[in-house]
């Protein structure tokens, strides 16, 4: 990637039970003192030159004052995503200090009745009619002055490859970025794009492996300055199959 002037970064997203481990039922004990995600974080930091962010400490601090994950799903809510966004942007700004970081004052933030229902659906529960309204009410972030437009495209329906292409009208934005990221990134992608001239989110959903070699020509044509690979903790194993274009 360096030959193509693309800077690679890694973002590791802890699972909800990692952040809220105090809610494990009595009788459950740790199998290993160090979790796999912690091992990956330490290994990448020690043996590679890839900058990596693992926002566990920021999330643990923020949970004292805010609910960060949906009770009925596996994803963080808007508040949790924003906490992680700040940590990610802190990492990127070390190399690109000109990047704009959105403040809470850039958003209208209000509690709304909303839900992420992947867990409740798996259990056959209608979350909105089963749980109290207060358990389904979370801070929702809306940008006051968005500058981006987005186009959603299915690149390959069979392989479930889809992209979200953002373009900003803000002339101060000069950099281009690609985020190879799963559904956790969907809670922040629309405002992460506010920091870039162009940003593409290549969606790695449905638990599938990274397919960077398949998208290599598209990535090269996009010519990003920044490539961020993000994965949730439960899909860590797919990092073992992560291949960069020049390896093909």
Features from the language model and the residues they span:
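Extracellular glycan-modifying ectodomains
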Residues: 1-248
